């Protein structure tokens, strides 16, 4: 992913304020509620029967944190996203059989959650920079599929 110096500064500056546990749990929870077919990958997480159950589910929150920690690794390795996410791409492709479109959906949900948490600070230029990173991460995660 190619970011200008300003974009890189905007992304790293805002990301330093992100509570990965809170934002990750909310982003994954929203993905599971808004796109319910994604729940099939999380059947072992227990009750996902309604929005309240999903958003309050401790396993969803914990996995959301794990997802955002991986995203953080990507932010530290923007010049090598493919390498950074190679093992996760292989896992999601070969073992979990996750549709790679779900990575893009999660990225879009993450944008909504960041906007909700950071309001005016998540202005259009910051969103544009995050969107680039998110798409780069989704593409890297989908790499094994090609």
From Swiss-Prot:
Keywords in alphabetical order: Acetylation, Heme, Iron, Metal-binding, Oxygen transport, Phosphoprotein, S-nitrosylation, Transport
Domain Globin span(s) in chain numbering: 2-146
Modified residues (S-nitrosocysteine): 93
Location of Phosphothreonine modifications: 12
Gene3D superfamilies reported in the protein's UniProt record: Globins (1.10.490.10)
A single GO BP: hydrogen peroxide catabolic process
Subunit structure: Heterotetramer of two alpha chains and two beta chains.
Protein name: Hemoglobin subunit beta
Taxonomic path: Eukaryota, Metazoa, Chordata, Craniata, Vertebrata
């Amino acid at each position: 992913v190619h970011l200008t110096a300003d974009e890189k500064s905007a992304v790293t500056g805002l990301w330093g304020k992100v509570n990965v546990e809170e934002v990750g749990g909310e982003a994954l929870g929203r993905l599971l509620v808004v796109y319910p077919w994604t729940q099939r990958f999380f059947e072992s997480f227990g009750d996902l029967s309604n929005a309240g159950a999903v958003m309050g589910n401790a396993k969803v929150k914990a996995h959301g944190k794990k997802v955002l920690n991986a995203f953080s690794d990507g932010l530290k390795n923007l010049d090598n996203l493919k390498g950074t996410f190679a093992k996760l791409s292989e896992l999601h492709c070969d073992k979990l059989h996750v549709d790679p479109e779900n990575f893009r959906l999660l990225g879009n949900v993450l944008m909504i959650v960041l906007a909700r948490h950071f309001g005016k600070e998540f202005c259009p230029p910051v969103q544009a920079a995050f969107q680039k990173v998110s798409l780069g991460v989704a593409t890297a995660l989908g790499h094994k599929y090609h």
